[in-house]
Amino acid sequence: PRVLLIGDSISMGYTLDVREMLKGKANVHRIPTNGGPTTNGLKNIKAWLGDSKWDVIHFNWGLHDLKYIAEDPSKRADPKAPGSHLQVPLADYEKNLAELVKLMQATGAKLIWCNTTPVPAGSDGRVEGDEKKYNEAAARVMTAAGIPTDDLCTHANAKLKDVQLPANVHYSPSGYHYLAEKVASVIAENLSKK
């Protein structure tokens, strides 16, 4: 079976481990770039899905949506600075996700939503705990669409001090391995249900 991972740098960090863990069970592919915010997803999703047949699509958007930017969207801005704003406000995020879900459902693949991992204090260009609101919005979309959730946020939180870099949304190599264990097990579970 063919599995597609869609996500940002967090998914880039766990892809190789997931591929290794699912060796012999699934061929694990990942989009060729950082998925960025949902707005970027909407621009590129058709190209990422291509004409291939996917059995499972494990997807996340969030950390780039809840990022603060100013004039230059490629740079993070201080959330408290005048003129800084969320890259994708919450209501738009929810709407964009619903649209992305429709486009992915059209492939006939089994979809798995991976929720957004924790934003710690002192993380550049983001507000601590903002992932909670975004995950709640995403949960509404996924519940309505009947899509299961890989609760990577709770998994990360269980060992956050050990696995996440200080004041940073990213993880250590062993931290990515820890995330990969959860991702691989959720994908394996869903492959057996197909």
Where are these regions (language model features)?
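Catalytic nucleophile-elbow at a beta strand-turn-alpha helix junction centered on a G-D-S/GDSL motif
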Residues: P1-L16, P37, H64-L66
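Alpha-helical cap/lid subdomain in secreted, periplasmic
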Residues: E20-N27, T39-K193
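Short beta->alpha junction loops
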Residues: R30-P37
